[in-house]
A protein has these predicted regions:
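Short, well-ordered alpha-helical segments enriched in acidic and aromatic residues
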Residues: 17-34
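Residue-level signal for short amphipathic helical patches enriched in basic/charged
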Residues: 14, 18, 93
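A beta-strand edge to alpha-helix "cap/lid" segment located at domain peripheries
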Residues: 34-36, 47-110
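Short, conserved clusters of charged catalytic residues that mark active-site
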Residues: 6-7, 57
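Basic/polar N-terminal segments that are highly enriched at the extreme N-terminus
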Residues: 1-3, 109-110
Length: 110
């Protein structure tokens, strides 16, 4: 398994655990985050908008982890309370740093 795949898995675990130090260490300075409600957040915007959801004990079950060039494509199922949802995200790397995350929302898993 590649180092980028391992970093990606650890990135999601760090988010679930609320480990901001790991996240800070692995984001590029010019990091951007985009999702349908939050297109093109910068690093500070990511922490302002997304970090309040970290450390809530949610778990990610990966159904797809594919490395292609500088990208890792991730599909996961995650629980939030009683609901389980499925999303796909594309993480773009610059070396071992995550430079960009693009989120594509999925659906609830029944």
């Amino acid at each position: 398994m590649s180092n980028r795949i391992e970093i990606t898995k650890d990135f999601y675990k760090a988010f679930a655990d609320g480990n901001r130090d790991f996240i800070e260490e692995h984001l590029a300075e010019d990091f951007t985050f985009s999702s349908p409600p939050d297109p093109h957040l910068d690093r500070a915007g990511y922490f302002r908008r997304c970090w309040p959801g970290a450390g809530k004990g949610g778990q990610f079950e990966f159904t797809r982890l594919i490395e292609s060039g500088d990208e890792v494509i991730v599909t996961y199922e995650a629980q939030q309370g009683e609901n389980t949802g499925r999303n796909t995200e594309i993480l773009t790397f610059d070396g071992d740093k995550i430079r960009k995350v693009e989120v594509y929302f999925g659906w609830n898993v029944i």
